[in-house]
Design a protein with these regions (language model features):
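Phosphate/diphosphate-binding loops
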Residues: 163-177
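Short, flexible loop/turn motifs enriched in small residues
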Residues: 115-122
């Protein structure tokens, strides 16, 4: 069958150009040049169930390692200015049901939209200031506030940069509050 990476890449391509639901993925795929490039892809292989089957086999640790390998490869190959980074922490509310016990991220918390009745997920992102190249991200529970989380997120950011961030005094991090 198709690899987990293929499903991830296809979902990313679809979201970038013409987002459709997973149940409409085959119809979208047929309308693209991808069908000629990947003739082994079938209607059944692009069913929504196949997407969920493949995504459920990926854990956050594996995805984090893949992200880090990608970032490291780009930083090794490109001239990306790491002297300044921008940090943004945000949250977004979801419609995860109140009785859904499987969700560990979606929690009730404060958000600017005033939707405290809905579960939310928090997201932190570091990008290079000059090129807006994403360096690090973290997703965490919606009931954890930014002030508490910032210290942990910044330490994890520097840990992810590794030797590239030896002299933290040489990097300026810009954020709003």
């Amino acid at each position: 069958g198709l690899s987990h990476g293929f499903y991830l890449a296809l979902a990313a391509i679809n979201r970038s150009f013409a987002p459709v639901s997973k149940s409409s993925m085959w119809r979208w795929f047929q309308s693209t040049v991808l069908l000629r490039r990947f003739p082994e892809v079938t209607r059944e292989s692009l069913s929504s169930q196949r997407f969920w089957d493949n995504m459920s086999q990926l854990d956050s640790a594996s995805l984090g390692r893949a992200w880090q390998q990608l970032i490291d490869a780009v930083l090794d190959r490109e001239r990306i200015d790491l002297s300044q980074a921008s940090f943004d922490g945000t949250n977004f509310y979801t419609f995860i049901g109140s009785f859904n016990v499987r969700s560990t991220l979606g929690r009730r918390g404060k958000n600017k939209q005033g939707r405290g009745n809905l579960r939310q997920v928090n997201y932190a992102l570091f990008c290079t200031r000059k090129d807006q190249f994403p360096l690090y991200f973290d997703v965490y529970e919606g009931n954890r506030n930014d002030v508490t989380e910032f210290g942990l997120v910044i330490e994890n950011f520097f840990r992810a940069l590794g030797a590239r961030a030896v002299d933290r005094r040489g990097m300026t991090i810009v954020f709003d509050k």
